[in-house]
Design a protein with these regions (language model features):
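S-adenosylmethionine
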Residues: 137-230
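S-adenosyl-L-methionine
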Residues: 9-12, 21-84, 116-147
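Conserved SAM-binding loop of SAM-dependent methyltransferases across substrates and taxa
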Residues: 90-102
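Conserved Rossmann-like nucleotide-cofactor binding loop
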Residues: 113
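Conserved SAM-binding motif I beta-strand of class I
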Residues: 104-109
Length: 238
């Protein structure tokens, strides 16, 4: 039942290069194996180039993406849905949703180099005609897509470099009346509850974990750092 799937979501904290859909399993062991299989597939994708400090291009690692997407699928199910991946990077989230049974996946990215990487990764997806890329900057206005979006997923900029950089991502999805929005954000973010309420959404925290930050930029003094993040779910109330 849908309510039971949601409760499970909120309470739960192969050598062939051709990518196939990953079948759902009804038991815990099957879910663990499914997540591991997904993590291997996502980790094998060509990585995000991560060149822009301004765009806060921190890549979502395959293991984290797999854990998060599996939790989303447990509660909201990607099966047969149109999924929008906003600020798609190398396509790890959108392609992950495709593995989990999405009917259509639209990936929006403003970085031309990143779009090229997504296109290379899409080639590895079997029957990839249901995956689409849009080269466009997210600016708070509606993005034209071929059919109604059922679920949006994103790892938006958190506003480290530019204050409120995440707002246009939320405004875009709100303008499109997306019923379910799943996103990653810094655990220190304090504006999310009020943002959700003022736009007619309920905010749920799915779980929290560490987000690894590779030394991709010159201002990083350490080889690798990490920050604490939360994975959230927004549900439209009307």
């Amino acid at each position: 039942k849908p309510c039971n799937r949601l409760n499970m979501l909120l309470e739960c904290n192969n050598s062939n290069n051709s990518i196939n859909r990953i079948s759902a399993s009804s038991n815990d062991v099957g879910e663990v194996m499914r997540q591991r299989h997904l993590a291997m597939r996502l980790s094998s994708l060509k990585p995000h180039p991560c060149h822009s400090v301004e765009l806060e291009q921190y890549p979502t690692e395959g293991n984290l993406a797999a854990a998060w997407l599996t939790k989303i699928d447990l509660g909201d199910s990607f099966e047969g849905k149109h999924v929008l991946d906003l600020g798609a990077g190398n396509g790890v989230l959108g392609i992950g949703a495709a593995f989990l049974g999405a009917r259509r996946v639209t990936m929006v990215e403003c970085d031309r180099t990143a779009i090229d990487v997504i296109e290379e990764n899409i080639v590895e997806v079997e029957g990839n005609e249901f995956l689409e890329t849009i080269h466009q900057r997210v600016d708070g206005t509606t993005i034209e897509v071929e059919s109604k979006v059922d679920i949006a997923i994103m790892n938006p900029p958190w506003g480290v470099q530019t204050k409120h950089a995440d707002r246009v991502f939320f405004e875009t999805l709100f303008s499109m009346n997306v019923p379910l929005i799943h996103f990653i954000h810094s655990i220190e973010a304090e504006h999310l509850a009020s943002l959700a309420k003022s736009n007619g959404y309920a905010l749920h925290s799915i779980y929290q974990t560490d987000f690894r930050l590779p030394a991709a930029y010159s201002h990083h003094k350490q080889q690798q750092g990490s920050t604490r993040i939360r994975c959230y779910r927004l549900e439209r109330l009307n």
